[in-house]
Amino acid sequence: MASKILLNVQEEVTCPICLELLTEPLSLDCGHSLCRACITVSNKEAVTSMGGKSSCPVCGISYSFEHLQANQHLANIVERLKEVKLSPDNGKKRDLCDHHGEKLLLFCKEDRKVICWLCERSQEHRGHHTVLTEEVFKECQEKLQAVLKRLKKEEEEAEKLEADIREEKTSWKYQVQTERQRIQTEFDQLRSILNNEEQRELQRLEEEEKKTLDKFAEAEDELVQQKQLVRELISDVECRSQWSTMELLQDMSGIMKWSEIWRLKKPKMVSKKLKTVFHAPDLSRMLQMFRELTAVRCYWVDVTLNSVNLNLNLVLSEDQRQVISVPIWPFQCYNYGVLGSQYFSSGKHYWEVDVSKKTAWILGVYCRTYSRHMKYVVRRCANRQNLYTKYRPLFGYWVIGLQNKCKYGVFEESLSSDPEVLTLSMAVPPCRVGVFLDYEAGIVSFFNVTSHGSLIYKFSKCCFSQPVYPYFNPWNCPAPMTLCPPSS
């Protein structure tokens, strides 16, 4: 009912010329109203064609343009009508034209909007291309489906990019955490190295202090004894000086002889300067050594000892990681040592050996250069020095060794028949030795793990014609020689 009333009101305020709601309505003498623009155009046409007379387009009654009056009341009604909205529960609202109340059955291509048949005839849409809404609906549906498909594809791409970003973020955070741990580990190790160096320097200073103070104490004791002796002589001489002439003359030779013989023995001079003078360690060099050791430790392999063809004087542990040399009385053994169970014919490999309690040892790698095999030999007498010269590259040994508790040596890579042992200088005696093999490059390197990975010696341009075996020789020292498990 309300909708019908609104439609009736809308008809009353619709311009009979443009068929739109009145805009700036002007009332004629007959009572009808027109838009100011429409009546102005109509008046101009009348002046031109009818000799200046104008008539109402509704009833035909003539009017004078000068007598037209603005109808504010109708203008207010039009404004209120534009503000009126039909209730949402009216299902036909969307299908009806807001201006004419007719069904929206047409689509204007120029204005891209749905219109009714009256809108099509209005001045606003006159001459425009219109089609039925059913025809354009299918086209819109196809376009919407295409847009929907593209948007879903964009959504999938966005989700994929989001997942990639999350994965990259996780990977980045892991890299940062790994790098943080690596930095902390390296600095912890550097601090450990510095602490060890500090303790070593303090221990050296303490040992020198003890030795020097012992010398001072010995000198003081000696001077105390001499001072006591000279006091006794002085007392004796003073006492004799009080004797009578006969007493003094009868015993004069004895006291004079002692007085002439005795001389003050000066103690040995003790150096006023410290032998141990601390110099700050070269941190860059220490860091370089540490990094070199860390680099080769990446190739750490689990090496065990081979019990095949084992010499009689050698005993292996159950886990085949430790070898001990035992005496076979009354014989002395030509100790050929023991090979590793693993052999290498390519690649890079690293292992570590604990020799902390030994006073003699040999270790490195062995490569069979001839058809020689490891055999045990027991002899009543053996020249150890001559035996020691057998451990050289000419016979397939690339090794270093310790003899007589403090003499470290290595045979240079000379093929001469009379090689010389190269003496190695060790600032810190190695308790743990690392061995690195690069088969293709022909390199065998030895590292002093005890001294933060300092390089002991490096064989280069080694010629390996056969597989290479780790080699261990405890010599005649009964202390154990132990293979360290990886990363221990």
From Swiss-Prot:
Pathway membership: Protein modification; protein ubiquitination
GO terms under cellular component: cytoplasm; cytosol; mitochondrion
EC number of the protein: 2.3.2.27
Enzyme class: transferase
GO biological process: defense response to virus; innate immune response; positive regulation of DNA-binding transcription factor activity; protein ubiquitination; regulation of gene expression
ZnF endpoints (B box-type): 92-134
UniProt entry keywords in alphabetical sequence: Antiviral defense, Coiled coil, Cytoplasm, Metal-binding, Mitochondrion, Repeat, Transferase, Ubl conjugation pathway, Zinc, Zinc-finger
SUPFAM superfamilies registered for this protein in UniProt: B-box zinc-binding domain (SSF57845), Concanavalin A-like lectins/glucanases (SSF49899), RING/U-box (SSF57850)
GO MF entries: identical protein binding; ubiquitin protein ligase activity; zinc ion binding
Domain spans labelled B30.2/SPRY: 283-488
Gene3D superfamilies, alphabetized: 2.60.120.920, Classic Zinc Finger, Zinc/RING finger domain, C3HC4 (zinc finger)
Chain intervals annotated as zinc finger (RING-type): 15-60
Coiled-coil segments on the chain, per record: 131-239
Annotated compartments: Cytoplasm; Mitochondrion
Annotated residues for binding of Zn(2+): 97, 100, 119, 125
Annotated catalysed reactions: S-ubiquitinyl-[E2 ubiquitin-conjugating enzyme]-L-cysteine + [acceptor protein]-L-lysine = [E2 ubiquitin-conjugating enzyme]-L-cysteine + N(6)-ubiquitinyl-[acceptor protein]-L-lysine
Pfam families (alphabetical): SPRY, zf-B_box, zf-C3HC4_4
Cross-referenced InterPro entries: B30.2/SPRY, B30.2/SPRY_sf, Butyrophylin_SPRY, ConA-like_dom_sf, SPRY_dom, TRIM/RBCC, TRIM34_PRY/SPRY, Znf_B-box
Primary site of residence: cytoplasm
UniProt similarity note: Belongs to the TRIM/RBCC family.
Biological function: Functions as antiviral protein and contributes to the defense against retroviral infections. Acts as a capsid-specific restriction factor with the help of TRIM5 and prevents infection from non-host-adapted retroviruses. During influenza A virus infection, promotes programmed cell death by targeting ZBP1 for 'Lys-63'-linked polyubiquitination. In turn, promotes ZBP1 recruitment of RIPK3 to mediate virus-induced programmed necrosis. Negatively regulates the function of mitochondria by enhancing mitochondrial depolarization leading to cytochrome c release and mitochondria-dependent apoptosis.
Record text on subunit structure and interactions: Homotrimer. Interacts (via B-box and SPRY domain) with TRIM5.
Cross-referenced PANTHER family: E3 UBIQUITIN-PROTEIN LIGASE TRIM
The name this protein goes by in its record: E3 ubiquitin-protein ligase TRIM34
Organism encoding this protein: Homo sapiens
Organism placement in taxonomy: Eukaryota, Metazoa, Chordata, Craniata, Vertebrata
